[in-house]
Amino acid sequence: MAHSVKIYDTCIGCTQCVRACPTDVLEMVPWDGCKASQIASAPRTEDCVGCKRCESACPTDFLSVRVYLGAETTRSMGLAY
């Protein structure tokens, strides 16, 4: 599946998205840009199933992690125009 996962600098380093991901797409990496000194990273996007649990778990109201579904998935879900 060709989904993309974007992590934004609004990440507060809480690890909620990492713990919510059923396929271990996300991991925490060191980053000096926030209080927690870590940020979510998505090194294994090829394993993303598009469930968006990471988005739902994010306490910053979807501002830090976003899953963009691939074209094949949006077509099969009837979301494509």
Curated annotation (Swiss-Prot):
Molecular-function GO term, any one: electron transfer activity
Reactions it catalyzes: reduced [plastocyanin] + hnu + oxidized [2Fe-2S]-[ferredoxin] = oxidized [plastocyanin] + reduced [2Fe-2S]-[ferredoxin]
Membrane-topology descriptor: Peripheral membrane protein
Cofactor(s) in the UniProt record: [4Fe-4S] cluster
InterPro entries referenced in this protein's UniProt entry, alphabetically: 4Fe4S_Fe-S-bd, 4Fe4S_Fe_S_CS, PSI_iron-sulfur_center, PSI_PsaC
GO-annotated cellular components: chloroplast thylakoid membrane; photosystem I
Top class in the EC scheme: oxidoreductase
Subcellular location: Plastid, Chloroplast thylakoid membrane
Stated name of the protein: Photosystem I iron-sulfur center
Lineage start: Eukaryota, Viridiplantae, Streptophyta, Embryophyta, Bryophyta
